[in-house]
Swiss-Prot record:
Disruption phenotype: Very low levels of RNAi-mediated methylation and derepression of silenced genes. Impaired RNA polymerase V-chromatin associations (Pol V). The mutant idn1-1 fails to establish DNA methylation and exhibits a late-flowering phenotype.
Record bears the keyword Coiled coil: yes
Gene Ontology CC terms, in alphabetical order: RNA polymerase V complex
Gene name for this UniProt entry: DMS3
Positions in coiled-coil regions: 52-93, 353-386
Protein name (database record): Protein DEFECTIVE IN MERISTEM SILENCING 3
Keyword Coiled coil assigned: yes
Lineage: Eukaryota, Viridiplantae, Streptophyta, Embryophyta, Tracheophyta
Listed GO MF terms: protein homodimerization activity
BP-aspect Gene Ontology terms: gene silencing by siRNA-directed DNA methylation; regulatory ncRNA-mediated gene silencing
Record organism: Arabidopsis thaliana (Mouse-ear cress)
């Protein structure tokens, strides 16, 4: 190709190699490069704005649901409050009619005699704790309950309930026995310990408690006795019969295998006791009354039947004992009380006071309960209103943040003008 021996010379031209950093700066300063950079950054910013807007939108939806929940709660509470207002008005009308009744509200002589009869039955047991307490009450009246020793004493079992039917009263008294009928009922354990003290050797200190009180009135407690502590009893925690002023327990009636109620079933003993309205609520610090505590523990679900034959026929349905008006007694499942027995001479009183008086007392108790529930509902309404207002405020702040996010996203997505 080339002549042999001919020397070829190459003239080298130096290359102009520029600094990469300078090239980058130069490229970025150019209009085209600047436009490309801005477009790439805009895409990333738009994606972030979209993610942020979706997050804010989700937060707004959750906060809106929270506001609706508070509004639903307020609607329910206000409807409950309106129902209570109507019930209070109806009860006020009922009480007005009772108050204008020609039958006096004060206790009549029959009721007084009934109380004296029960007190006399207890006083016959001279050497009992119940006898001492009843004698102190007879001698000192209302002042007896102000003694430090007796402040926590609710009373004697026999005097804390009444039974409409004399025969049933005797049957229930026989079921419980004299010891339980004369038991001393106390509100709490401190009241129980106040009844009796002991020396260093574990012997009863006759100079303290009920023994000292008995000595002061010429009585000596020679028999052992039961003291029932209400706050230590396991109370009934189920429902009560609706709109029942005596707050009877809503117990399931016994059913035979065919689904029918046994013939002759009259009810549960615990619900056949009439209780003074003052003892239906808040006898214990937990708000329970005597029916849920004392009488539920004495009778549990004791069933009452018309005859012994009815009771025996219902054996498959009896779980906590049963009694019949003709004297039949089943203590527990499988334990029958047979043979002749001496009748307990301390019975529940028969309520012979004016029904008008009883109804008025029950209405007063119901009115007190309704007003208490209304106050609690009003407090719940105020609390729910505060929570709703707080939720609405937070929703407004979040909405402002969402609007700002949308505005920024709109600015980012505007088309850029490419220079010509």
């Amino acid at each position: 190709m080339y002549p042999t021996g001919q020397q070829i010379s190459f003239q080298t031209t130096p290359l102009n190699v520029q600094d990469p950093t300078r090239m980058m700066n130069l490229d970025q300063s150019s209009p085209v490069a600047r436009n490309e950079t801005q477009n790439g950054g805009g895409i990333a910013h738009a994606e972030f704005a979209m993610f942020n807007s979706k997050r804010l939108e989700s937060d707004l939806e959750a906060m809106g649901n929270k506001i609706k929940q508070h509004e639903d709660n307020l609607k329910f509470l206000k409807s409950q409050k309106n129902k209570m207002d109507e019930a209070i008005v109806d009860l006020q009308v009922h009480m007005s009619k009772l108050n204008s009744s020609p039958t006096p509200r004060s206790e009549n002589s029959d009721n007084s005699l009934q109380g004296e009869d029960i007190n006399a039955q207890i006083l016959r047991h001279e050497n009992s704790a119940a006898g001492v307490l009843s004698l102190v009450e007879t001698l000192h009246g209302a002042q007896a309950s102000q003694l430090m020793l007796t402040k926590g004493v609710v009373g004697v079992v026999a005097k804390l309930g009444k039974v409409n039917d004399e025969n049933l009263s005797q049957i229930l008294s026989n079921y419980l026995g004299t010891r339980s009928m004369l038991a001393v009922v106390c509100r709490n354990y401190e009241s129980v310990t106040a009844l009796e003290a002991y020396d260093n050797h574990g012997n009863i200190d006759i100079n303290a408690g009920l023994h000292c009180l008995g000595s002061s009135i010429g009585r000596e407690i020679g028999d052992s006795f039961d003291a029932i502590c209400l706050e230590n009893l396991r109370p009934y925690v189920g429902q009560h019969i609706a709109d029942d002023l005596q707050r009877r327990l809503d117990l399931l009636k016994p059913k035979l295998p065919n689904g029918e109620c046994p013939p002759g079933f009259l009810g549960f003993a615990v619900n056949m006791i009439q209780i003074d309205p003052a003892y239906l609520l808040c006898v214990t610090s937990y708000g329970y009354g005597l029916r849920e505590t004392l009488f539920y523990n004495l009778f549990s679900r004791l069933q009452v039947y018309k005859t012994r034959a009815d009771m025996i026929s219902a054996l498959p349905c009896i779980s906590d004992g049963a009694v019949s008006l003709d004297g039949g007694i089943i203590r527990k499942t499988g334990i029958f009380n047979l043979g002749n027995r001496d009748e307990v001479n301390v019975r529940f009183a028969k309520p012979t006071a004016s029904r008008t008086m009883d109804n008025y007392s029950e209405a007063e108790k119901k009115m007190k309960e309704l007003k208490w529930k209304k106050e609690k509902t009003l407090e719940d309404i105020k609390r729910e209103q505060v929570l709703r207002e707080h939720a609405v405020f937070n929703f407004g702040k979040k909405k402002e943040e969402f609007v700002r996010c949308l505005a920024q996203s709109s600015c980012t997505n505007q088309p850029m003008n490419t220079p010509r």
